[in-house]
Amino acid sequence: MKSLFTIGYEQSTAGVFFDALTQAGVGLLVDVRAVAASRRPGFSKRQLAAGLDERGVGYVHLQKLGTPKEGRLAARSGHADEMLRIFERHLKTPEAQHELDELTALAKTSIARSSRPLCLLCYERDPAHCHRQRLADELHARLGLKVEHLFCAPV
């Protein structure tokens, strides 16, 4: 069974993060943040894409698969369940469905063309408190991928 990875960069450095991806053999990182910017050095879209490129890892940003602002605010307030309910509603929108189909196609291509798996990226360290778990579950249901979560050592 082919694998799909997920990773969050909360409490990590770019170096530790890149090492985790390299050790797992990731070939494509799919950024599922609504806003691909970060106060953490190395995790904003351009810096992240450049760091991945240096390591031979592709980068795609699927903005519409990110959690809407009201969901991010709920998560920051410690209301992960509310964030997930908001994300479930958002996932039913045509824009999110289109990008979910695009994500599925990327995963299929990754499986067909490469032995290097795809990895979903968001901020939250714990996948149980992050919408990327829901997206990973969807890819498992659609393609039968085994979901594995990568964890960066906190610094």
Predicted segments with their positions:
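Residues lining hydrophobic/aromatic ligand-binding pockets adjacent to catalytic sites
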Residues: 1-155
